[in-house]
Amino acid sequence: MNLNELQPAAGSRKLRNRVGRGTSSGNGKTSGRGQKGQKARGKVRLGFEGGQMPLYRRIPKRGFTNISRKEFAVVNLEKLNTFADGTEVTPALLIENGIVKNQKSGIKVLAVGQLEKKLTVKAHKFSGAAKAAIEQAGGTTEVL
């Protein structure tokens, strides 16, 4: 056996069927699509259901986007433990330390985790539980 005599295994190299290339191929003229009609022609658009009212039009429209919605940057209590006792925590300090990326419409402090430090926290909003936890730890809150 020589290198030029090597053959691929039988059935391992099947040629793809090229349609529309002459009648003797068995898939010429209509290219295996039959006669006329929608299926013999181009594609139907995405979401087309054969003339039936499509799903995206059967389902009612709902809700709206509130243009005056304010989105707050969230700070959890557990993140405030990184500061030393007696620190005055301001939005600028939070951004500087990488706790929040940007201020958005303001900063809101939420009561996720425990606070073990006595801090003066200045933010735009506080949840009730967060405010209580800061004051219980001996700190103070100030709404900006």
From Swiss-Prot:
PROSITE patterns: RIBOSOMAL_L15. Residues 1-44 are annotated as: Disordered. Keywords: Ribonucleoprotein, Ribosomal protein, RNA-binding, rRNA-binding. GO terms for molecular function: rRNA binding; structural constituent of ribosome. InterPro entries: Ribosomal_uL15, Ribosomal_uL15/eL18, Ribosomal_uL15/eL18_sf, Ribosomal_uL15_bac-type, Ribosomal_uL15_CS. One of its GO terms (cellular component) is cytosolic large ribosomal subunit. SUPFAM superfamilies: Ribosomal proteins L15p and L18e (SSF52080). The keyword Iron does not apply. Residues 23-35 have a biased composition (Gly residues). One of its GO terms (biological process) is translation. Binds to the 23S rRNA. Part of the 50S ribosomal subunit. Belongs to the universal ribosomal protein uL15 family. HAMAP family: Ribosomal_uL15. This is Large ribosomal subunit protein uL15.
